[in-house]
A protein has these predicted regions:
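Short, flexible helix/strand-to-coil boundary loops that buttress conserved ligand/catalytic motifs
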Residues: 6-7, 54
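A short, polar/charged loop-to-alpha-helix boundary motif
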Residues: 8-25
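ATP-binding/phosphotransfer module of carbohydrate and carboxylate kinases, centering on a glycine-rich
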Residues: 20, 24-187
Length: 187
């Protein structure tokens, strides 16, 4: 069942603001999101977060890195995943921060909804098995569950690669077609 919310925006977990203390490196600017929030999960744990916030900072810490010579920031951000698969130190610093951000988001979710499964999606599901398992382990490490939760909860990669959004949209469309037509009135 798809939970829509009053304004149709339920489940926008990427825009939940997360604690940044200990997540950002010394002198690292506060991450901003396209939605206008500062420090939400998407400002760190997304391709846009890499392009806009993480890569520019880490390139100042890894001077003369190949990614700094790419020219197009969007293209450079897309290349970070491949560098992570090769265990490049700059890319690993970025993915460690992303794992920490997702872990903190899952911790927040654990405290308000106590789910039995936490699914990890996005570009990481399209990486090598070794990198996927490393990233999943890092997210698990940064997710603080109570003992009772840790015993029963599962942290897993989304099945069928990154189709969760498409699946949810299809279910919502089907439910809308099957719902009785509501009478509308105008003033």
């Amino acid at each position: 069942r798809v939970v829509r919310g009053a304004a149709g925006m339920a489940g926008e977990l990427g825009h939940v603001q997360i604690p940044l203390h200990g997540l950002l490196a010394e002198g690292q600017p506060l991450p901003t999101c396209n939605c206008g929030f500062v420090g939400d999960a998407e400002s760190i744990a997304s391709l846009t977060g890499i392009e806009r916030n993480l890569l520019p900072y880490w390139l100042t810490r890894f001077e003369n890195h190949e990614l700094g010579r790419v020219g197009d920031p969007k293209q450079a951000a897309k290349l970070v995943r491949g560098y992570g698969e090769r265990e490049d130190p700059l890319a690993m610093a970025i993915f460690e921060q992303q794992a920490m951000a997702i872990g903190r988001l899952f911790t927040i979710a654990a405290n308000y909804s106590d789910p039995d499964t936490y699914f990890l999606g996005g570009g990481v599901v399209e990486t090598t098995p070794t990198f996927r398992q490393w990233f999943l382990a890092r997210v698990r490490h940064h997710t603080a569950l109570r003992d009772e939760q840790a015993r029963v909860a599962t942290l897993a990669l989304v099945p069928d690669l990154d189709m969760a959004g498409a699946r949810g949209a299809a279910i919502a469309a089907l439910e809308a077609l099957q719902a009785p037509v509501r009478a509308r009135t105008s003033l």
